[in-house]
Regions:
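Short hydrophobic alpha-helices and adjacent helix-cap/hinge residues
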Residues: 2-5, 11, 26-322
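C-terminal segment of classical bacterial N-terminal signal peptides
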Residues: 15-25
């Protein structure tokens, strides 16, 4: 009798352990693959990419990323977008406006979380930034253009004519320049506006601008960001100050910025994506999110190279990029 009871207890214990193992296995997160398409490689978009990945990992989600870079090619974007939809991924991340537009054109059902998009409504990705009403949501890289212009005028107080170079095909760039024009009225400044179509245009365009303006402003433009070392080589040689739309461009030879932190923007987008996967939200009702705090950054090497002395008032609040 004792032996039988011992056998029953032993069997029960084994079955209990097996049940625990089965329960643990069942509780383990099911691996999920999501798509992530990036328009092109440059520091800002790379930082956003890392922010997305880090945020998803921090949430403890068992996610694998199908990482694709379109190399600024529209046909690549289209092919990547269509393949992601065909794979029936439960979520697609898109970095930069053209990437988001391409994925949105490929599907109106799969949830899309985008970042590095200046204005989602202007880009026709959502019906309203506060109430998207589509399968798209995300984080905006709208930068503080007014504060950037104020910094420019502190660094170059006698400036009368400002130049700007951007890609006219990027809606986000046109949106920022429209803001710049309104803000320039406060200082009674004249604007010299030149556009480029691709990276190859930047060198000649920059050469034609330096010497004709007192300073240059460049927005968060993907073509200019990719060509920033080329632009900076020309402007620094001409001792022409360049105020940039974000920190990566400033670090690549610009003089100063009050910039967007693309890593944090990526983290915001990553957490929004995690909420969607966990069933805590849907793009249709998730408002576009924005960065609320910005830091002034000065490229110390560039300042010395072009002979700009940083006013004491600026040194009190700005951080220096060594």
């Amino acid at each position: 009798m004792i032996k039988q009871r011992s056998l029953v207890i032993a069997v029960a214990a084994i079955l209990g352990m097996a049940g625990m193992t089965l329960s643990t296995a069942q509780a383990a997160p099911v691996p999920t693959t999501v798509g992530l398409v990036q328009l092109v490689e440059h520091p800002a978009l790379d930082a956003a990419n890392k922010g997305i990945v880090d945020a998803m990992k921090a949430r403890g989600l068992n996610v694998t990323f199908d990482q694709q870079n379109a190399q600024a090619d529209q046909s690549n974007l289209s092919n990547i977008s269509q393949r992601f939809v065909a794979q029936k991924y439960p979520l697609i991340f898109a970095i930069a406006t053209p990437a988001a537009q391409s994925v949105a054109n490929a599907t109106d059902k799969t949830p899309i979380v985008a970042t590095a998009v200046t204005d989602f409504a202007v880009a026709k990705l959502v019906k309203d930034n506060a109430k998207p009403g589509t399968n798209v949501t995300g984080s905006s890289d709208l930068n503080p253009v007014a504060a950037q212009l104020d910094l420019l005028m502190q660094l170059v107080p006698n400036a009368k004519t400002i130049g700007t170079i951007y890609n006219s095909s990027e809606i986000n760039s046109e949106f920022q320049i429209a803001i710049l024009k309104k803000e320039m009225a406060r200082y009674n400044l004249k604007l010299v506006e030149l556009t480029v179509s691709n990276i190859n245009d930047v060198q000649q365009t920059a050469r034609s601008m330096v010497g004709k303006v007192d300073a240059i402003y460049v927005p968060t433009d993907n073509v200019i960001a990719s060509a920033m070392p080329v632009l900076a080589k020309i402007t620094n040689r001409a001792k022409s100050p360049v105020i940039t739309g974000e920190e990566g461009m400033c670090a690549n030879g610009g003089l100063a910025t009050v910039g967007v932190d693309y890593y944090n923007l990526g983290k915001i987008a990553g957490n929004m994506g995690a909420d969607i996967l966990e069933g805590k939200g849907k793009p249709q009702t998730m408002p576009i999110r924005y960065q609320t705090e910005f830091k002034a950054k000065i490229n110390e090497k560039t300042a010395k190279r072009i002979g700009i002395k940083i006013p004491e008032a600026v040194t009190k609040y700005a951080e220096f990029i060594k």
